[in-house]
Amino acid sequence: SIILTAHNKDWLINHVVNGILENTEGDYEVIFVIDGCSDRTEDVIFETIRSKDLKYKVAYAPDVFETKANNIGFKLAEGDKVIVVQDDMIIKEPGWNLRMQEPFNAFDDVFAVTSRTAHNWIFNPDTQHLNMEEDLDNCWCDICIHTDHATMKNTPRDVFAVRSSVNRGPLMIDHEDLKKMNYLDEEFAPLDM
């Protein structure tokens, strides 16, 4: 199941949708979550898929944070894997979804795979936020810092790096594991103070 949350991207969304349609292999569904759009994003999506043989669902959300919109899509998904594709991401690699599944096929303890970037977290001994009582909404929390970055720039094409955190889609997640967690936590944002 491919989850595409969209918020006011009428100028780009046709390229995003076509990238998925032209490069995804095997049986799949697309779940479009229209996230509080005030432009023509929804119309452009329907225009793009109108003549396509595509299994899809559409859900609507008020203008909510991306995590909540993703959860809406996850809960509608039928596949054993769910893939998050952001509304500004154009897929260009044929069979990209099968390639992302390779770590799941090779190991039985994989939770998620990203095609973009992953890293580990370590305690920041110079943190300014540890033991702060107030909730700061003007900066990222610095209690932990990311390290050991694995990106397209520093990781060979055929290497899958193991890290504690994956972010930025496309992001494939084991759907059963996600259900066991009761999906993504919509309130806890460890980096946002």
Place the predicted regions along the sequence by residue.
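Short, acidic, metal-binding catalytic loop of nucleotide-sugar glycosyltransferases
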Residues: N18-D27
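Short beta-strand/loop segment that forms part of the nucleotide-sugar
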Residues: D27-C37, A59-P62
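Glycine-rich, basic loop-to-helix element that forms the pyrophosphate-binding segment
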Residues: A61-A77
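A recurrent flexible, glycine/aromatic-enriched loop bordering the glycosyltransferase active site
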Residues: T67-K68, C141-D142, T147-I173
